[in-house]
């Protein structure tokens, strides 16, 4: 059985997730015993990827209350919560706030996230978090972005222009290619900035 919850507001924490949420936000997470209890209920790799991706991609609209969590419950399952990366509308330099130099840690959704702040009290979590962010920086380089995006942009170029024309949208081929340049510029510079923060 797969349980899925959409976590929307702090006052509406799903009961299934509430135990873990309270343990992290109200407990002494700096202690080894409490942290081990937390790890028994959450998939740490999933959470690190979820958070580091949102931070690295500069998701200025990100907050932990507009995400989806899931877990497999039942016999033979771990029952650990996993986080789903969802809305990426305001990422990769697509608006003035989410440019490559944005300190996403200061965005309200991150700075006010009690779950993250609770986990950051634990040294082991801090180490794992830093390590995962370094992996993102090493993996998501300008060269890899160009290698992936250049053929992708070319593949969709004609379709995007035709769709824009068909529906009377303002998107031009030049604008489409400029958006691709913005994304490549983002990857060229983001690693330098995210590690400073």
Model-based region annotation:
Residues 9-197:
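Middle-to-C-terminal accessory/interaction subdomains
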Residues 1-11:
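Conserved ATP-binding subdomain of kinase catalytic cores across diverse folds
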């Amino acid at each position: 059985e797969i349980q899925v919850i959409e976590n929307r507001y702090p006052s509406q924490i799903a009961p299934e997730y509430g135990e873990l949420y309270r343990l992290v936000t109200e407990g002494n997470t700096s202690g080894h015993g409490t942290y081990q209890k937390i790890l028994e209920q959450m998939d740490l790799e999933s959470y690190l990827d979820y958070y580091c991706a949102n931070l690295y991609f500069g998701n200025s609209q990100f907050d932990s209350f507009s995400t989806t969590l899931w877990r497999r419950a039942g016999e033979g399952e771990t029952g650990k919560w996993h986080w789903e990366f969802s809305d990426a509308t305001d990422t990769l330099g697509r608006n003035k706030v989410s440019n490559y130099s944005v300190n996403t840690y200061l965005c309200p959704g991150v700075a006010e996230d009690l779950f993250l702040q609770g986990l950051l009290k634990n040294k082991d979590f801090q180490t794992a978090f830093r390590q995962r962010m370094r992996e993102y920086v090493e993996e998501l380089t300008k060269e890899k972005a160009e290698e992936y995006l250049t053929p992708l942009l070319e593949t969709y170029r004609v379709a995007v222009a035709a769709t824009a024309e068909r529906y009377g949208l303002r998107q031009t081929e030049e604008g489409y290619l400029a958006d691709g340049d913005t994304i490549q510029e983002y990857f060229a510079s983001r690693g330098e900035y995210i590690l400073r923060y």
